[in-house]
Amino acid sequence: TTMHILSPRSMPRRPEPTGWALHQRDGTITSGTEHFSPQRFEGGGMRYLRFKRWLNELRFTSGDINAVFFEEVRRHAGVDAAHAYGGFMGHLTAWCEQHNIPYQGVPVGTIKKHATGKGNASKDDMVAVAKARGYFPIDDNEADALAILHWAMEGEF
């Protein structure tokens, strides 16, 4: 199983879900979104604990995960978003190291250019590409995860 994860680009006023996609050995592709926004009355680290629990659940339910590819965001809308991204990146890469799973970040422009032919594609463009491939993404985060999956499946790394 190859796992493709988008690290959340959450911001306090507008939290976004994490898009994900899995390519199973039998060729089955599953995808979706997951929310890790801080809940009321929670400490700041709870979102990361939920993230790690979710990673472990995916690993357990999908069998062996042989690679993780994630969206490498180089610009953030603000300090809070940068801190959240750094926290998720730290936990994701440590989790991969702990389980001896290779991982690679993929720049946003690379994902968009591979999917649409232009590195500055809009969210709607990314959703349209996913739909053209036969998927029904909930939002652009899931569409981006599917784009990363296809980038990796086509050996672009």
What are these regions (language model features)?
Residues T1-F157:
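Phosphate- and other anionic-substrate recognition elements at nucleic-acid/protein interfaces
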